[in-house]
């Protein structure tokens, strides 16, 4: 480019006009964002959100205390203690997840033979203290009860790919 052309473009503010033309081009197009708290995008059935412990339809918890999720967790965020029951089966007495350590990899969900521990659809959970991110068995079961319908639908939608 010649010096005269560069000088002419600088005097006419050519770049400024190009920027405004680009702005006007997108100004009249439909918006590309959503109004988040009021509108939400659909989540994938494979979305990994807040953890939950599921129950059987009769109300009994699914976890059989095999501790596979604890063993497979790369962040060592899961702690399980169990005791044998009168009928010879094991059940958990303590099931804790330290959400500050969790990396949401989904290995715990994949390792569970009875689909007891799952990562649900909830991604909107915040706390004021770190202690609230230490989930115990009661909190995990409450999450499972709260999100059971959505969790079951997600697992059913994902079943052909498992």
From Swiss-Prot:
InterPro entries: 4Fe4S_Fe-S-bd, 4Fe4S_Fe_S_CS, NADH_quinone_OxRdtase_chainI. [4Fe-4S] cluster 1 binds at residues 63, 66, 69, 112. Binds 2 [4Fe-4S] clusters per subunit. Residues 53-83, 93-122 form the 4Fe-4S ferredoxin-type domain. GO terms for molecular function: 4 iron, 4 sulfur cluster binding; iron ion binding; NADH:ubiquinone reductase (non-electrogenic) activity; quinone binding. It is a peripheral membrane protein. It catalyses: a quinone + NADH + 5 H(+)(in) = a quinol + NAD(+) + 4 H(+)(out). It is found in: Cell inner membrane. One of its GO terms (cellular component) is plasma membrane. [4Fe-4S] cluster 2 binds at residues 73, 102, 105, 108. Its cofactor is [4Fe-4S] cluster. One of its GO terms (biological process) is aerobic respiration. Pfam families: Fer4_7. Its EC number is 7.1.1.-. Keywords: 4Fe-4S, Cell inner membrane, Cell membrane, Iron, Iron-sulfur, Membrane, Metal-binding, NAD, Quinone, Repeat, Translocase, Ubiquinone. PANTHER family: NADH DEHYDROGENASE [UBIQUINONE] IRON-SULFUR PROTEIN 8, MITOCHONDRIAL (PTHR10849:SF20), NADH DEHYDROGENASE UBIQUINONE IRON-SULFUR PROTEIN 8, MITOCHONDRIAL (PTHR10849). NDH-1 is composed of 14 different subunits. Subunits NuoA, H, J, K, L, M, N constitute the membrane sector of the complex. Belongs to the complex I 23 kDa subunit family. NDH-1 shuttles electrons from NADH, via FMN and iron-sulfur (Fe-S) centers, to quinones in the respiratory chain. The immediate electron acceptor for the enzyme in this species is believed to be ubiquinone. Couples the redox reaction to proton translocation (for every two electrons transferred, four hydrogen ions are translocated across the cytoplasmic membrane), and thus conserves the redox energy in a proton gradient. This is NADH-quinone oxidoreductase subunit I. It comes from Erythrobacter litoralis (strain HTCC2594). The lineage of its organism: Bacteria, Pseudomonadati, Pseudomonadota, Alphaproteobacteria, Sphingomonadales.
């Amino acid at each position: 480019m010649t010096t005269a052309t560069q000088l002419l473009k600088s005097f006419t503010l050519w770049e400024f006009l190009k920027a405004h033309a680009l702005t006007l081009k997108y100004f009249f197009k439909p918006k590309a964002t959503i109004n988040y708290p009021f509108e939400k995008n659909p989540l994938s059935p494979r979305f990994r959100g807040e953890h939950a412990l599921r129950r059987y339809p009769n109300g009994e918890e699914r976890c059989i205390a095999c501790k596979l999720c604890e063993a497979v967790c790369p962040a060592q965020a899961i702690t399980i203690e169990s005791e044998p029951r009168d009928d010879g089966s094991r059940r958990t007495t303590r099931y804790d997840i330290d959400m500050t350590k969790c990396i949401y990899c989904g290995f715990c969900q994949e390792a569970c033979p009875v689909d007891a521990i799952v990562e649900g659809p909830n991604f909107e959970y915040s706390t004021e203290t770190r202690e609230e991110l230490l989930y115990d068995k009661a909190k995990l079961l409450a999450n499972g009860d709260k999100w059971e319908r959505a969790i079951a639908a997600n697992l059913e939608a994902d079943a052909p790919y498992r």
